[in-house]
């Protein structure tokens, strides 16, 4: 029997997608209310059953293209059947700092009593005061409910797990475990790390950890996968805006260069706004040489290049590029220029379609993308440029501000020959 380990890694943005992780809407989204959705980074509550149907349609369309789609609830359910994995998660989630001294043992013993599928649901979906049986920590729980309310959370829900792109990012032969910008999202990295550490799909595979540790306080160093694109030719694009900081970007680049995994990191200096929270909300690849962009933001991007430099104390040098971001990206891939499809429609329509993730498409293979149906102007322009656009419904899935690119964490993707 072969003992050779499976190799995981993402080697381009437009090569054939082989394996991807997603997370279906579920209990966490049922917890969203008009009073808490802003804190949980959703613009509105969603019709959860319809969102589930639309997400299943998204998964089905990827599987029809031969892509191995892994769903996070399922992965977590299988992971926590390993007692060591369950202990690792609960030791970090059920603490006096997160739950309070009076309920740690009660909450933990109740969670440990659940069957794995239900437990995984609560780890992602959160635990409300009313979920815990009254017999568990009865007096303290009674006071907690009376003071904070029956719908207050002992463990907050994680509805943004729907956007698996951000929590970790696979860059060539390894992965980053991202310290997220908003507190509402930081526990997502813990759960994904547990999957990578203990689930057989990953525990028996070969890959590097480039950066990040959920056991560590990273301070001002934050990174989210929507900003990170390994585009091929040894190049990585990283957006530096609202969510990903220069502190994290420098450390990722240093790690990649030290292992010879990348030859250049192009930093895209973005304006700090929710509409352009990540690089992939204004720029994404649709083919080996074709990108879709929101020009109002992309033309303002300030590009910097980081390259290995053994003579530097930090092993790299940095310079501000004189050319535009699109010119720098094209040059890094050995292309004369990129074919560019801008957000469609007049100025009003283009702003609406960018807000509705018109430029946030995921490439399944060269020239084939998945995008939201509502972005009709942009989708039409992509089709005229020769791109096959597979559409999914945006009515519910888009309320968290993320499209096909945001809702996928590629784990294995083929390189492109530039």
Swiss-Prot record:
Pathway: Amino-acid degradation; L-arginine degradation via ADI pathway; carbamoyl phosphate from L-arginine: step 1/2. One of its GO terms (biological process) is arginine catabolic process to ornithine. Keywords: Arginine metabolism, Cytoplasm, Hydrolase. It holds the Pfam family ADI. GO terms for cellular component: cytoplasm. It is found in: Cytoplasm. Homotetramer (Possible). Belongs to the arginine deiminase family. This is Arginine deiminase. It comes from Pseudomonas aeruginosa (strain ATCC 15692 / DSM 22644 / CIP 104116 / JCM 14847 / LMG 12228 / 1C / PRS 101 / PAO1).
